[in-house]
C-alpha cells in the first residue's frame, strides 16, 4: 500500500526524468505497482481511509512520484456531470488534442509539491489518450474538462515536467483568448 512516505517530493531527480516505457505484456510487478497507484487515489478520496492512513487526497498519481521511472498513471476523478473516470494505464499517450486551451480556476496542485504555487496552468481543452489497462486492453479515451487536465498533469510526470513549469512566470494568471475556465 502506498502512503505519503512513498511519494517523493519536488527536487528529487526521478521527477525530472523521462520515464521508460513498460514492456507489454506487463510483468506481475508492474501490474502490482500500477494497481497500487490506483488504490492510493481511490483510498485518498475516502475521508475515513485518508484519515486512518494519513493520505493527502489526490485525483491522479504517476509512477515517477513513487520513484519508479516507468510510464504508468492512475486517475480517479469525476467530471462536471458526475461521470467517474477511473483508469490505471500503462504507456499512456496523448495522440491528439484541441487547439483550444483550458485551465483550473483554482490552479493545480500535486502530491509531490508541498507548497501552494499560484497561477494558471494552461492545458488542452480536449485530448485523446491511448494506453493499456491492467487487464491488457488497449483503450482510447476522449477527454475534456477536469479529466483532460488530470490526464495531462499525470502524463507530464512521465516526461519529467512539473505543473508549475507550465505557469507563465511573467504573468502567472494570464488567460489567453478563448481559454475555458474549469471550476473544481
Swiss-Prot record:
The keyword Ribonucleoprotein does not apply. The active site is at residue 154. InterPro entries: Peptide_deformylase, Peptide_deformylase_sf. This is Peptide deformylase 2. It comes from the Bacteria. Keywords: Hydrolase, Iron, Metal-binding, Protein biosynthesis. Its cofactor is Fe(2+). Gene3D superfamilies: Peptide deformylase. Binds 1 Fe(2+) ion. It catalyses: N-terminal N-formyl-L-methionyl-[peptide] + H2O = N-terminal L-methionyl-[peptide] + formate. Belongs to the polypeptide deformylase family.
Amino acid at each position: 500500500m502506498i502512503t505519503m512516505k512513498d511519494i517523493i517530493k519536488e527536487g528529487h531527480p526521478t521527477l525530472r526524468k523521462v520515464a521508460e516505457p513498460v514492456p507489454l505484456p506487463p510483468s506481475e510487478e508492474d501490474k502490482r505497482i500500477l494497481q497500487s497507484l490506483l488504490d492510493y487515489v481511490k483510498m485518498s478520496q475516502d475521508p475515513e481511509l485518508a484519515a486512518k492512513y494519513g493520505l493527502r487526497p489526490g485525483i491522479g498519481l504517476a509512477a515517477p512520484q513513487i520513484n519508479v521511472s516507468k510510464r504508468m498513471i492512475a486517475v480517479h476523478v469525476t467530471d462536471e456531470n458526475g461521470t467517474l473516470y477511473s483508469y490505471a494505464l500503462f504507456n499512456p499517450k496523448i495522440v491528439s488534442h484541441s487547439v483550444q486551451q483550458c485551465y483550473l480556476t483554482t490552479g493545480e496542485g500535486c502530491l509531490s509539491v508541498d507548497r501552494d504555487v499560484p497561477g494558471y496552468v494552461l492545458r488542452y481543452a480536449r485530448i485523446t489518450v491511448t494506453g493499456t489497462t491492467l487487464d491488457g486492453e488497449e483503450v482510447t479515451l476522449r477527454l475534456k474538462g477536469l479529466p483532460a487536465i488530470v490526464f495531462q498533469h499525470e502524463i507530464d510526470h512521465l516526461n519529467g515536467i512539473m505543473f508549475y513549469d507550465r505557469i507563465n512566470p511573467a504573468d502567472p494568471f494570464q488567460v489567453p483568448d478563448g481559454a475555458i475556465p474549469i471550476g473544481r
